[in-house]
């Protein structure tokens, strides 16, 4: 049987090679030598597409392409470069959907924030990701594809990675897409993959208590970041609908369980919102909740989202709140905001580009004009142009 014939008869629904095991790849090319599957897997993690896998026979590369396979199901649509050195990546999925990532350089190694869902069902008042609700979960290969694409784009290799740390804090709730996130964690940390230790990975959750306990029981060693944002149940319910299901007490109990099982210190994310959660009473309650528990509070000033009605506190007010915590002996820091000049907060860039593309579609429909086709370039403080015209009939705007 020829490679083409074998592929035509294969169950190839996913059509993405990235993250498949050598056994899974071998099943796609059953007549290939055993080493071919290992080569293909290595090429995928190196950010190579099928035509660039030159040590694989031309016949098999053609067979893969004709069967509709790609190495990475994610393409870089645009790149925005910020004055602070960070970069906002806009990724397009094969079905046309968009998600975001942020590349953040640090002295201790660059971090990449990736998305786990298109949109989000959590509906947090201060987050642009959930304004349109959940569109769909990302497949594990699409989460992995963001890391591989940026690592290659930033000049990294498998052995000398540009991406040192990964943060699951982009669009979506990771624990609402648990199975795909678990497979992603296994693949991104695999010795024959990117080999990023789970200790270099942070997972941020809005507070799905059952998911936190499941993650702890899985043997995970990732750093757990919990979006707290208010120490009071009634106030938290106003800005985070998930609080209607899980109380602050249940959430802190789950955090303590995660620490007990994994030995990993838990981070509480706390977005400072003017007049909402920056009072003396909030600081005192945070001290009470975290007393005697190895954890850390990560403060960040709100990135304002249009239409939310929520305001960002002044820098001196944020500093004062931090001082209150420190004076009470609470482990806390005020985190730097990355990419403020390039819509760096969750969902802001995706929302803006969807609006731009929708407006362009309407204009094109009105004038009968075709979409434009341009090469992707990086522009400081601004956007690159789309790499290609995409069939927007498959693009979900919700």
Language model regions located:
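Auxiliary Fe-S-binding modules of radical SAM enzymes
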Residues: 1-97, 256-265, 272-398
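Short beta->alpha linker loops
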Residues: 138, 207, 337-341
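Exposed loop/turn and edge beta-strand positions of beta-sandwich/beta-sheet ligand-binding modules
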Residues: 85, 110, 162
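Short linear Ser/Thr-Pro motifs
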Residues: 81-82, 115-116, 129, 204, ...
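Canonical Radical SAM [4Fe-4S] cluster-binding loop centered on the CxxxCxxC motif
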Residues: 105-149
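A short loop-to-beta-strand scaffold at the N-terminal edge of the catalytic core in hydrolase folds
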Residues: 98-103
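Conserved AdoMet/S-adenosylmethionine-binding subsite of the radical SAM
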Residues: 151-330
């Amino acid at each position: 049987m020829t490679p083409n014939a074998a592929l035509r008869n294969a169950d190839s629904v996913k059509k993405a090679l990235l993250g498949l095991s050598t056994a899974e790849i071998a099943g796609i090319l059953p007549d290939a030598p055993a080493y071919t599957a290992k080569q293909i897997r290595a090429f995928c993690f190196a950010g190579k597409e099928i035509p660039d896998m030159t040590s694989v026979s031309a016949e098999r590369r053609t067979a893969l392409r004709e069967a509709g396979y790609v190495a990475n199901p994610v393409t870089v649509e645009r790149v925005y470069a910020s004055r602070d050195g960070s970069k906002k990546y806009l990724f397009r999925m094969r079905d046309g959907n968009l998600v975001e990532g942020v590349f953040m350089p640090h002295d201790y190694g660059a971090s990449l924030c990736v998305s786990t869902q298109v949109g989000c069902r959590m509906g947090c008042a201060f987050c642009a990701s959930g304004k349109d609700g959940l569109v769909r979960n990302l497949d594990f290969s699409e989460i992995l594809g963001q890391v591989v694409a940026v690592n290659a784009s930033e000049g990294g290799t498998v052995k000398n990675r540009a991406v040192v740390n990964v943060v699951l804090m982009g669009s979506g709730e990771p624990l609402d897409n648990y199975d795909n996130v678990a497979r992603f964690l296994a693949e991104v940390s695999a010795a024959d993959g990117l080999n990023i230790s789970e200790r270099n990975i942070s997972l941020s959750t809005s507070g799905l208590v059952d998911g936190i306990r499941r993650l702890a029981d899985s043997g995970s060693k990732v750093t757990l970041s919990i979006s707290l944002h208010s120490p009071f149940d009634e106030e938290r319910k106003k800005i985070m609908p998930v609080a209607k299901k899980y109380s602050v007490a249940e959430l802190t109990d789950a955090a303590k369980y995660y620490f007990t099982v994994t030995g990993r210190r838990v981070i509480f994310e706390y977005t400072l919102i003017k007049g909402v959660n920056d009072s003396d009473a909030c600081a005192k309650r945070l001290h009470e909740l975290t007393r005697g528990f190895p954890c850390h509070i990560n403060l960040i000033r709100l990135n304002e989202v249009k239409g939310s009605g929520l305001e960002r506190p002044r820098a001196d007010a944020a500093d004062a709140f931090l001082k209150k915590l420190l004076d009470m002996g609470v482990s806390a820091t005020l985190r730097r905001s990355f990419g403020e000049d390039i819509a760096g907060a969750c969902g802001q860039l995706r929302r803006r580009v969807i609006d731009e593309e929708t407006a362009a579609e309407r204009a094109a429909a009105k004038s009968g004009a075709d979409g434009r086709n341009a090469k992707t370039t990086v522009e400081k403080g601004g956007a690159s142009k789309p790499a290609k015209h995409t069939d927007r009939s498959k693009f979900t705007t919700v």
